[in-house]
Curated annotation (Swiss-Prot):
UniProt-listed Enzyme Commission number(s): 3.5.1.96
Function text: Transforms N(2)-succinylglutamate into succinate and glutamate.
Protein's recorded name: Succinylglutamate desuccinylase
Bridged cysteine pairs (disulfide): none
Entries under HAMAP family matching the protein: Arg_catab_AstE
Lipoprotein recorded as keyword: no
Gene Ontology BP, a term: arginine catabolic process to glutamate
UniProt-annotated catalytic positions: 224
Family: Belongs to the AspA/AstE family. Succinylglutamate desuccinylase subfamily.
Cofactor dependence: Zn(2+)
Gene: astE
Amino acid sequence: MLQALKESKDFLQLTLAQPQHFDETFTFMLGSHTQVEVWDTGVIVFEPKVARGKDIVLSCAVHGNETAPIELCNGLIKSLLEERLIAEQRVLFLFGNPPAIINGTRFIDENLNRLFNGAHSVGEGLVNPERIRAKKLEFYVDKFFSSSKDNSHKIHYDLHTAIRGSKHEKFAIYPYRPGRKYSGEQIMFLEACGIDTVLFHHEPTTTFSYFSSLNYQADAFTIELGKVLPMGQNDMTRFIALNEMLSRLIGNKSLELPDFNAKTVNLYQVCRAINKGFDDFEFTFANDVENFTSFPKGYILAKEGGENIKVEHEVEAIVFPNAKVPVGQRTVLCLKPASTENIDG
């Protein structure tokens, strides 16, 4: 495996050749400047000889059919392996669900991004590949962050693409973080990446980004980069700014970020999540309605169990509507304009 990776510089290819697990870990040097550690299938770490104070996790393929982030991350890994990009920050790359990548599906048995923060072991326990993988991914993130310096700046960008179109093509979800202000610098970094819309979540979740935010106080985000497309059909020119900014971050180059300015970004507060209570749950709007479509107060968003579910605020926008989830899971997030008072500018 080591020789194959050294020759191809293609970590995704190596991962998909053995999607379940690697039988052995291996380590090698890039020149005299970076140690590369492969911990498992889809798990590779770059440890610079002299790190500059940031510990960066870049995860993708938590949903296997969300291909643009996979291509983006594999390109960054290849640049590092070819030494066109030299890491001056510690960085961990994760391909979340390799079997689902091969399958071209969101998941095999269960939505991996509902299984973090210990959810993998609740109820039935470790009964399917996604639950087992979620526990392993938590372990790898813990291993990475726990081996850093105490005062390091921990960052986790969990990269996705969305099922449906969106009025804001690229957007980020900032996990719930009570008692901690949101980072204006991080919001401006995202804006420089071409991600000009941020949602502030209102409650704990079982997502990968919330896991890192809660347990390691990382600046963590779930980042949506447009619409799901098959592998090889993504227009990667749409991610030039993101690729450039991530390369600068990894290489410890100047980010040249302006001060926080709310006028340059779209900020939303999640005001509620609507969970499915009955099998007959259905939305009243068309299946092709875009993310961030707004509805006025009193509008009937959905019906279930003989009851109407209505818009509660003057205006609410919606994201991630999905009526086909199992009973008990989230069908949609409702949003209102966000205040800037809890942002550290």
